[in-house]
């Protein structure tokens, strides 16, 4: 009985050892199967950390590159340095680099503000010149005053040119003006020729026409008594005995030619002359030839 019990216990021990060995082998297999995952995880994390470090490094390097670009700006053009003048110009007309170069030529300090260097240069090289601003504000004020003076000079020159009377060329004595058809009737009539530019002459002519067109026509003008009339387009006096003379009308900034039918007018397309009539002749009349020319011009401009 003892032997049987001993053999059974030994068999149980052997089975227990085998079971424990199989469990250990299973655990080892599981550990071996799990080990690559555990190894891969640190690898991936290491890669991620490396990528993060590289991104950070690139971010750090970018400002450095930008700083390098900003530290090396484009080379500026060198300003030519003129020699020292006999009289120093105002401080607002001198460039800072030129002033600095002049100070360096005379071995003067060019530090500080531009006005300080200008004062040092004046005191050293131009002791007799005292008309210079003492502050930057005074320099700005002087600059603005100079601009105002230039503008005022330009305005005064324009006003003088406008108010100055135009040059008048009178015909030579003994030579009457060229007249058509009748010379006996037009003796003693003087024509005044004004030398002006074409646009000014046209404006002056239109101004005269508009001023005369507003005057009443009932009063008999002296030109009818003298037997001559002044044609606006021809710019000279012509015989008044021919039929077809018309008084120009001026409405809405346009000169109009009255037609034979009452109440109808046509626009004046002919340009007036730049000659001024004598004082006793009316300046808003159109001769029959010019009336006909204006009608032909209107017909040619009409659409077919």
Curated annotation (Swiss-Prot):
UniProt-annotated location(s): Nucleus
Biological processes annotated in GO: lung-associated mesenchyme development; system development
Positions where Phosphoserine occurs in the chain: 221, 226
Region annotated Disordered, chain positions: 1-84, 147-176
Biased composition (Polar residues): 1-11
Keywords from the UniProt entry: Developmental protein, Nucleus, Phosphoprotein, Transcription, Transcription regulation
Pfam families cross-referenced by the UniProt entry: DCR, Dppa2_A
InterPro entries associated with the record: Dppa2/4, Dppa2/4_C_dom, Dppa2/4_central_dom
Modified residues (Phosphothreonine): 215
Biased composition (Basic and acidic residues): 12-29
One of the record's GO cellular component terms: nucleus
Record-level Gene Ontology MF annotations: chromatin binding
Role: May be involved in the maintenance of active epigenetic status of target genes. May inhibit differentiation of embryonic cells into a primitive ectoderm lineage.
Quaternary context: Interacts with DPPA2. Interacts with PCGF1.
Listed name of the protein: Developmental pluripotency-associated protein 4
The species this protein was found in: Homo sapiens (Human)
């Amino acid at each position: 009985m003892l032997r049987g019990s001993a053999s059974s216990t030994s068999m149980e021990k052997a089975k227990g050892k085998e079971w424990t060995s199989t469990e250990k082998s299973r655990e080892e297999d599981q550990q071996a199967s799990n080990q690559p995952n555990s190894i891969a995880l640190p690898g991936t994390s290491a890669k991620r950390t490396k990528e993060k470090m590289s991104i950070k490094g690139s971010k750090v390097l970018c400002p450095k590159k930008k700083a390098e670009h900003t530290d090396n700006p484009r080379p500026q053009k060198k300003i030519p340095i003129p020699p020292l003048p006999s009289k120093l110009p105002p401080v607002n007309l001198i460039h800072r680099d030129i002033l600095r170069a002049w100070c360096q030529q005379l071995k003067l300090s060019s530090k500080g503000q531009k006005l300080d260097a200008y004062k040092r240069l004046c005191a050293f090289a131009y002791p007799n010149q005292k008309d210079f601003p003492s502050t930057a504000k005074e320099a700005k004020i002087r600059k603005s005053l100079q601009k105002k003076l230039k503008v005022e000079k330009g305005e005064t020159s324009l006003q003088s040119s406008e108010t100055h009377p135009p040059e008048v060329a009178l015909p030579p004595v003994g030579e009457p003006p060229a007249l058509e058809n009748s010379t006996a009737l037009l003796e003693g009539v003087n024509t005044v020729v004004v030398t002006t530019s074409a646009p000014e002459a046209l404006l002056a002519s239109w101004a005269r026409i508009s001023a005369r067109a507003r005057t009443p026509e009932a009063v008999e003008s002296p030109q009818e008594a003298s037997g001559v009339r002044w044609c606006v387009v021809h710019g000279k006096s012509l015989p008044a005995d021919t039929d077809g003379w018309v008084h120009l009308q001026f409405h809405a900034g346009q000169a109009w030619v009255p037609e034979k039918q009452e109440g109808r007018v046509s626009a004046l397309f002919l340009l007036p002359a730049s000659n001024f009539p004598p004082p006793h002749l009316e300046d808003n009349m159109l001769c029959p030839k010019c009336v006909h020319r204006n009608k032909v011009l209107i017909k040619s401009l009409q659409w077919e």
